[in-house]
Amino acid sequence: MIKAVKGTRDLLPPSTEVWNRVEQVARAIFRAYNYHEIRTPIFEETQLFSRGVGTETDIVTKEMYTFEDRDGSSLTLRPENTASVIRAYIEHRLDQRPGVQKLYYIGPMFRRERPQKGRYRQFFQIGAEAIGSESPVVDAEVIELVVEILKGVGLSGFKLLINSVGDHNCRPQYVEKLKAELKDKAAGMCGDCQRRAETNPLRVLDCKVEADQPIIDALPSIVDYLCEPCRAHFEAVKSYLTDRGIEYEVRPRMVRGLDYYMRTTFEVVHGALGAQNSVLGGGRYDGLAESLGSRVHAPGIGFSIGEDRLVMSVEGDQPASQLDLCIAPLGEAAVRHAAILARDFRRSGHSVELVEGKLKRAMELANKFGARYTLIIGDNEIAAGRYALKNMATGEQVELTRDEIAARLDAASN
């Protein structure tokens, strides 16, 4: 028997209904903040990610699905979507459009990670990018947007972590300090950290090996090395978050796993997810567009929510989907009549299931479907224009006209 590939899975009902609710909430909140959807290809030229994400990141060195196309070009299934969105921004000259470009996306990404709870090799992200402003007001609004989505889907008990990783003016001094500190300490760390201590010391801070954490926690804080513009920017972001009533915790060694981040970085964690407890991450990337060939300065900030992990956090709290109406026709004439009724009720926005066969079986299925009502139709009901409608929760059964049934369904749905 052929099964789903390791690290992938089939999403089945009723779980898919929770996914749909989460996405509907996110789309509604994106609309409220004037974000518009963008859809990019699921594969891109490999150099987009090696240049954009960073050659020393785990994503590029270990996790990308890369293949050679028939023309010899190297292509990669997208491991994240910010680089793709910026590529589209440059290619289609979105800088020519008025104002900050606010774009969101929902879709699958691909990384060859070790499958574990909430982490898959094909996973889904809900993300957004605000491109065209360096203002700390935009940073705070993007973080507020994240918080609104999490609250909107019913997630509570999460923690917002923030930091500033400086810019090209102040970060080099910090990197040199890190390199000096790691000169004697790296030998006691994992192989990746030993290599990165020389090639990209900042990536050492992103190490997830538990045994290395005490060494990392003792390393200098980047906050102490921020230049005055970066420090002022970070203080403004914190102030705007406080104005909005958004609680946060500063994590001075949080750098996130992508090389393009600059200044503000943030992450949301949730205890229900265990050791790998991150729900989302994001940050500012003011130099990414230029690194991908843009002739126009295009500062931006964005985030991506791990939808698989978010759904896992809220799935148990979501109400079960309920079928509005189950129709039980008794006889051939009733089946024909019921099909028309079912179509009309569906056009009015109600979920309807028509069940042929014996009444006992229809009632059993209505219970299994979680139907609010069951409509029983026979020859007598058709002739009289009144139908037996049974409330499946109370057991009450009444005879109503078609319009009265429609009114009752409307009332139950509101």
UniProtKB/Swiss-Prot annotation:
Homodimer. Belongs to the class-II aminoacyl-tRNA synthetase family. One of its GO terms (molecular function) is ATP binding. It catalyses: tRNA(His) + L-histidine + ATP = L-histidyl-tRNA(His) + AMP + diphosphate + H(+). Keywords: Aminoacyl-tRNA synthetase, ATP-binding, Cytoplasm, Ligase, Nucleotide-binding, Protein biosynthesis. GO terms for cellular component: cytoplasm. Its EC number is 6.1.1.21. InterPro entries: aa-tRNA-synth_II, aa-tRNA-synth_II/BPL/LPL, Anticodon-bd, Anticodon-bd_dom_sf, His-tRNA-ligase, HisRS-like_core, HisRS/HisZ, HisRS_anticodon. CDD domains: HisRS-like_core, HisRS_anticodon. One of its GO terms (biological process) is histidyl-tRNA aminoacylation. Gene3D superfamilies: Anticodon-binding domain (3.40.50.800), Bira Bifunctional Protein, Domain 2 (3.30.930.10). It is found in: Cytoplasm. The lineage of its organism: Bacteria, Pseudomonadati, Acidobacteriota, Terriglobia, Bryobacterales. This is Histidine--tRNA ligase.
